[in-house]
């Protein structure tokens, strides 16, 4: 990695992505998040890195992208490190009011992320989300486990599909959930 020399590298064994994640430390004791991906994912990871820069520019509390490139292990990105606790693993230790406050804050953060326009080449939302709804409904119908009055959910979705028509296209996070959030030592949600 051209711009950084790290003296420690500790694997972070969490999450579902193929990326290998590490907490790395430089000679001055500064910590960073290092993500390493297979070289075949270069284009996708470069797009993700650039998008992270757009999100960070909105003031969203997050690991800030610092460097992107390739090295002998694949594609890497270096981001700022956030000291704190895993939100998913610790939410149950918080009061109901604290949980509500963090949930409300998560909604405000997502609203900021949705200010980013979708790429021009992305297909129309109505087509995309109707196909996605069709797929999810089909999966539910083929699943042996059913919700009591589950058809009411399907009926609701089908009755409101018209709302997808003419919607503005914005960036969709796609993986925005408590498992990808931290509560910093400063008590902020990241």
Predicted regions and their residues:
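ATP-binding pocket architecture of kinase catalytic cores
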Residues: 11-124, 148, 166
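Conserved N-terminal boundary motif of the eukaryotic protein kinase catalytic domain
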Residues: 3-12
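Charge-rich, low-complexity amphipathic helices
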Residues: 77-78, 135-136, 179
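Conserved protein kinase catalytic/activation segment
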Residues: 180-190
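Acidic active-site catalytic centers that drive phospho-/nucleotidyl reactions
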Residues: 48, 173-175, 180
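Short, well-ordered coil/turn elements that cap or connect secondary structure elements
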Residues: 3-4, 57-60, 186
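An alpha-helical support segment within catalytic cores of ATP-dependent transferases
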Residues: 1-3, 115-174, 184-185
């Amino acid at each position: 990695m051209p711009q950084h020399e790290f003296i420690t590298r500790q694997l972070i064994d969490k999450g579902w992505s193929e990326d290998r994640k590490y907490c790395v430390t430089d000679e001055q004791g500064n910590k960073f998040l290092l993500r390493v991906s297979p070289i075949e994912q270069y284009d996708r990871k470069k797009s993700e890195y650039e998008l992270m820069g757009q999100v960070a520019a909105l003031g969203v509390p997050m690991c800030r992208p610092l460097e992107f490139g390739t090295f002998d292990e694949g594609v890497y990105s270096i981001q700022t490190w956030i000291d704190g606790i895993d939100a998913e693993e610790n939410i149950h230790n918080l009061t109901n009011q604290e949980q509500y406050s963090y949930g409300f804050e998560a909604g405000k953060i997502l609203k900021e992320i949705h200010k980013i326009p979708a790429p021009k080449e992305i297909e129309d939302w109505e087509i995309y989300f109707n196909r996605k709804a069709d797929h999810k409904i089909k999966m539910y119908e083929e699943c042996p486990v059913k919700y009591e009055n589950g058809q009411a959910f399907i009926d609701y979705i089908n009755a409101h599909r018209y709302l997808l028509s003419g919607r503005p296209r914005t960036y969709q996070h796609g993986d925005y959930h408590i498992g990808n959030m931290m509560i910093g030592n400063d008590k902020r949600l990241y």
